[in-house]
UniProtKB/Swiss-Prot annotation:
Endpoints of the signal sequence: 1-19
Protein name: Gamma-gliadin
UniProt record similarity statement: Belongs to the gliadin/glutenin family.
Other notes: The gamma-gliadins can be divided into 3 homology classes. Sequence divergence between the classes is due to single-base substitutions and to duplications or deletions within or near direct repeats.
Keywords: Repeat, Seed storage protein, Signal, Storage protein
Location of region: Disordered: 27-159
Function, in words: Gliadin is the major seed storage protein in wheat.
Length: 302
């Protein structure tokens, strides 16, 4: 339609222009004066102004009436449906009421009560510790068979005495020898053993004492003391006990008030040997009545 209107307007304009043109006798075309130009301007203004608004009116009326129609449907339909879907949000708080009611009641009531109940079987565990009491009881029985061992030397005293004397002979020789570890050297002893020999004798003494059974170690130390006493009685006037006194003094052992007496020598030996060899001797070892008091001098001196 627009093209037809434009073509008609152009045709009308050309016809009007050709009608107004004047040809001179010289052959030149003379255009009309400026007065006729407003006349063709009237049809240009009148015709397009009337025809051109018509398509604008059609385009404006047609889309404006059709497009608002879907706009009315979309807001009405989803806006009404979405609030309706919000209604199922109400049943969600309902199961929340069931969860706190069911699990909270059984868990505090059932599991808390059985867990303190299995703590009761913990009481038999200290009861099962009671069988640990018979273990120290058989330990008490072990010293009981030591009693026949004490009676064994009474039955075979000569064999036990000779065995202990032979075993403890290195200890007696070490206690009576003059070594260079002594601070005061006796003028009556001319031979002084070197340090290496003294160390060897001390090691032999401690090894022999460690090999003796523990229940006989006290008796073995008593045998050493008795041998020294017997040797002193044979060699009266000779200061054979000076190395023993000096050794005890070097070990920090308090000497008895009367070391020359038998009990003083015995107590000094009982303190010196365990300290030197690091051997445990029971405290009642000094009060035990050993069968060496009646030993002949010949046996103790050899």
């Amino acid at each position: 339609m627009k093209t037809l209107l434009i073509l008609t307007i152009l045709a009308m304009a050309t016809t009007i222009a050709t009608a107004n043109m004047q040809v001179d006798p010289s052959g030149q075309v003379q255009w009309p004066q400026q007065q006729p130009f407003p006349q063709p301007q009237q049809p240009f203004c009148q015709q397009p102004q009337r025809t051109i608004p018509q398509p604008h009116q059609t385009f404006h009326h047609q889309p404006q009436q059709t497009f608002p129609q879907p706009q009315q449907t979309y807001p009405h339909q989803p806006q009404q449906q979405f609030p309706q879907t919000q209604q199922p949000q109400q049943p969600f708080p309902q199961p929340q009421q069931t969860f706190p009611q069911q699990p909270q009641l059984p868990f505090p009531q059932q599991p808390q009560q059985p867990f303190p109940q299995p703590q009761q079987p913990q009481q038999p565990f200290p009861q099962s510790q009671q069988p640990q009491q018979p273990f120290p009881q058989p330990q008490q029985q072990f010293p009981q068979p030591q009693q026949p061992q004490q009676s064994f030397p009474q039955q075979q005293q000569p064999a036990i005495q000779s065995f202990l004397q032979q075993q403890m002979n290195p200890c007696k020789n070490f206690l009576l020898q003059q070594c260079n570890h002594v601070s005061l050297v006796s003028s009556l002893v001319s031979i002084i053993l070197p340090r290496s020999d003294c160390q060897v004798m001390q090691q032999q003494c401690c090894q022999q004492l460690a090999q003796i059974p523990q229940q006989l170690q006290c008796a073995a130390i008593h045998s050493v003391a008795h041998s020294i006493i017997m040797q002193q009685e044979q060699q009266q006037g000779v200061p054979i006990l000076r190395p023993l006194f000096q050794l005890a003094q070097g070990l920090g052992i308090i000497q008895p008030q009367q070391p020359a007496q038998l009990e003083g020598i015995r107590s000094l030996v009982l303190k010196t040997l365990p300290t030197m060899c690091n051997v445990y001797v029971p405290p009642d070892c000094s009060t035990i009545n050993v069968p060496y008091a009646n030993i002949d001098a010949g046996i103790g001196g050899q």
